[in-house]
């Protein structure tokens, strides 16, 4: 990939994002525990670039790659992209845009990779279902057999969320 093929030549990694992300999860300070790491955009991006995935273990104090992730994290610069902020607050869009690119030691820049609506965004919820199922089955494994987890997943998908929510509201409103 773009990162692994050129990582020795990377001087800086630039992430353009919206203001709330900059304010809430950009964290260049020392990360002293899993909660700190889980709330650091720089940590998450570094781990994803190096290991191609992020799991709950990625945030643990005993994670084998923590030093490598922290070293790469120091090369990351997070900046606000005003257009991303505008699109984040625009009700008809509610984009959660991010763009990443690399500045190399020779001063050149990589191609920019931009995502306006990540998987899980309301505009892409259906795309998230296979990933959510995989995660559900994997995390249910210690408690359920695979077949049981799959059956439970299928039953969850059959729930009529709207009517269930309305029923809950009626109960809360004493109707």
Residue spans for each PLM region:
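Terminal-appendage/accessory-domain detector
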Residues: 1-175
């Amino acid at each position: 990939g773009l990162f692994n093929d050129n990582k020795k030549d990377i001087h800086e990694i630039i992430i353009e994002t919206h203001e709330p992300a900059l304010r809430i999860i950009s964290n260049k300070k020392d990360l002293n525990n899993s909660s700190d790491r889980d709330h650091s955009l720089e940590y998450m991006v570094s781990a994803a670039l190096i290991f191609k995935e992020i799991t709950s273990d990625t945030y643990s104090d005993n994670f084998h790659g923590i030093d490598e992730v922290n070293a790469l994290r120091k090369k990351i610069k997070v900046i606000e992209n005003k257009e991303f902020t505008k699109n984040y607050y625009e009700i008809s869009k509610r984009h959660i845009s991010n763009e990443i690119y690399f500045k190399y030691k020779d001063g050149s820049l990589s191609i920019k990779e931009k995502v306006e609506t990540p998987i899980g965004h309301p505009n892409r919820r259906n795309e998230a279902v296979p990933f959510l199922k995989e995660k559900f089955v994997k995390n249910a494994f210690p408690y359920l057999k695979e077949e049981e987890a799959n059956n439970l997943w299928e039953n969850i998908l059959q729930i009529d969320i709207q009517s269930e929510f309305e029923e809950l509201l009626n109960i809360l409103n004493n109707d």
